[in-house]
């Protein structure tokens, strides 16, 4: 009996402990629920503001990610449309997009912010347009070069085809003729080709002669220039002495007949008999004028004006004959 009573007491105690534990756990859970309700029922203003800011930042970060994904996944056409719309509305301010939240309260709370990727996208679009314009210019230059090369090739082909066509036409034209006429026609063609070759050679020789002549003229001018420079240097030097001017024309004329006289004296009478007598008049050195002589007749007009008409015409006729002889023979007029 004593053992049974002790067992029952222990069982009752364990049951009481279990009930007490259950009650304590339920009370703690109810207390936590009530505390959480109290806590969630009213919040201080600072906590609500920080919570709204966190939500705004999260919404903005989500918007940025979504825009980046859409811009990266968009096609070439959408990029082009976007660049056109930006270029049209450059002067206008950028449209402000609000955060697309589900509730209206959150939408009203969110602040408007401009696009963050607008400047970078504009720069990239400018770079693209520049690179495209450069590519277009390069393509145009390449196309022009290709066209010029094709034109040159076409001209060369035309020249070769014309030459071949000429030879073919000649052969075709000579086929229906008899052999004698064919030989004559071929001879004529050969003569024409030889004449053309002679003309080309003559033109070449003329060009070479002209080049030589120009070279000689350049050399002569160089010699004259050097002589002139030396004369100028001699005049400018300190050892230069001024002298009176003497004409070399009269001196040459006087020297020539004196040389002729010396030659005739040395050759003897045989050479004098063999040679015909000279028709020219011998000029004495005493007769050469050395000073200017003035004729003061106290007359207002020249004496040639008082000559008769027939005498003046005869003198003029003689002068014309002398000038004609000078032009034809090259001898100076006395």
Curated annotation (Swiss-Prot):
Disulphide-bridged cysteine pairs: none
Q: What is its main location?
A: nucleus
Record-linked InterPro entries: SRRP53
Bias type Low complexity, positions: 265-278
Q: Where is this chain compositionally biased, Basic residues type? A: 14-24, 78-118
Q: Where is this region: Disordered?
A: 1-179, 198-220, 246-290
| Biased composition regions of type Basic and acidic residues, renumbered to the chain | 1-13, 44-62, 132-166, 198-218, 247-256
Tell me, in a sentence or two, what this protein's role is. Plays a role in pre-mRNA splicing. Involved in both constitutive and alternative pre-mRNA splicing. May have a role in the recognition of the 3' splice site during the second step of splicing.
- Assembly, per entry: Interacts (via Arg/Ser-rich domain) with LUC7L3, RBM39 and RSF1.
**By what name is this protein known?**
Serine/Arginine-related protein 53
């Amino acid at each position: 009996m004593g053992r049974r009573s002790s067992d029952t007491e222990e069982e009752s105690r364990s049951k009481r402990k279990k009930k007490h534990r259950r009650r304590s756990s339920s009370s703690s859970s109810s207390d936590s629920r009530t505390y959480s309700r109290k806590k969630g029922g009213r919040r201080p203003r600072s906590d609500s503001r920080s919570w709204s800011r966190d939500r705004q930042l999260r919404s903005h970060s989500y918007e940025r990610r979504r825009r980046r994904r859409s811009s990266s996944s968009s096609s070439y056409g959408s990029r082009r449309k976007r660049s056109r719309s930006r270029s049209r509305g450059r002067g206008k301010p950028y449209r402000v997009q609000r955060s697309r939240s589900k509730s209206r309260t959150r939408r009203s709370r969110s602040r408007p912010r401009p696009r963050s990727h607008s400047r970078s996208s504009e720069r990239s679009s400018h770079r693209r347009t520049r690179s495209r314009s450069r590519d277009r210019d390069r393509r145009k230059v390449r196309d022009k070069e290709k066209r010029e090369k094709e034109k040159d090739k076409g001209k060369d082909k035309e020249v070769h085809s014309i030459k071949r066509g000429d030879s073919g036409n000649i052969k075709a034209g000579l086929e229906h003729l008899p052999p004698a006429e064919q030989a004559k026609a071929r001879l004529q063609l050969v003569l024409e080709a030889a004449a053309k070759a002679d003309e080309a050679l003559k033109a070449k020789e003329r060009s070479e002669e002209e080049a030589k002549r120009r070279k000689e003229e350049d050399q002569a001018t160089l010699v004259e220039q050097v002589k002139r420079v030396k004369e100028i240097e001699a005049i400018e030097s300190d050892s230069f002495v001024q002298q009176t001017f003497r004409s070399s024309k009269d001196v040459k004329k006087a020297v020539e007949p004196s040389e002729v006289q010396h030659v005739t004296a040395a050759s003897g009478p045989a050479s004098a008999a063999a040679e015909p007598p000279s028709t020219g008049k011998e000029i004495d050195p005493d007769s050469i004028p050395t000073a200017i002589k003035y004729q003061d007749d106290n007359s207002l007009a020249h004496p040639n004006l008082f000559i008769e008409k027939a005498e003046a015409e005869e003198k003029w006729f003689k002068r014309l004959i002398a000038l004609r002889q000078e032009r034809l023979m090259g001898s100076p007029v006395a």
